[in-house]
Amino acid sequence: MTKYTSVNSSLPSLPRQTTPTRPATQTGRWDRMGMQTGNTPSSPLGFETKGSLNGSPTLRTTLDTSLSGTRSHPALRATRWMMGVNDIDSIQGDEDHPHDPGPDSDAKKRCASGKAPKDRPTSSVAVASTIRPPCCG
């Protein structure tokens, strides 16, 4: 018969923050993965377990830094577009990618001339190509 022990008992204890960023209103509970849930001041790993992505400057900085050097990969371009980080590529232009036209694209020329660009069919691969530039409304 095999004896199983708890994962938490075999791990070394991690130092906890001595001064929490905010007072805890509940004690919190441990979930199956060993992370503390509930309204707690900090997790055992030292970062906030509660909060949104946009409200956390640490996560936002990490994402901006990790995505800034990878302009040409299509999968990351789609991710950045959905997160709203793709604006710098539209300004600088990146003609090597069909779904991210540069400043000399036909859509922007038609937009400047007062005509709206033609709507293109939407597919899961070419979602970014159906978005109109900001000047077209």
From Swiss-Prot:
Coiled coil: none annotated. Residues 94-109 have a biased composition (Basic and acidic residues). It comes from Chaetomium globosum (strain ATCC 6205 / CBS 148.51 / DSM 1962 / NBRC 6347 / NRRL 1970). Part of the gene cluster that mediates the biosynthesis of the tetramic acid Sch210972, a potential anti-HIV fungal natural product that contains a decalin core. The PKS module of cghG together with the enoylreductase cghC catalyze the formation of the polyketide unit which is then conjugated to 4-hydroxyl-4-methyl glutamate (HMG) by the condensation domain of the cghG NRPS module. One unique structural feature of Sch210972 is the tetramic acid motif proposed to be derived from the non-proteinogenic amino acid HMG, by a Dieckmann-type condensation catalyzed by the reductase domain of cghG. Residues 15-27 have a biased composition (Low complexity). Residues 1-12, 51-71 have a biased composition (Polar residues). Pathway: Secondary metabolite biosynthesis. The lineage of its organism: Eukaryota, Fungi, Dikarya, Ascomycota, Pezizomycotina. Residues 1-137 are annotated as: Disordered. This is Sch210972 biosynthesis cluster protein E. It comes from the Eukaryota. The gene is cghE.
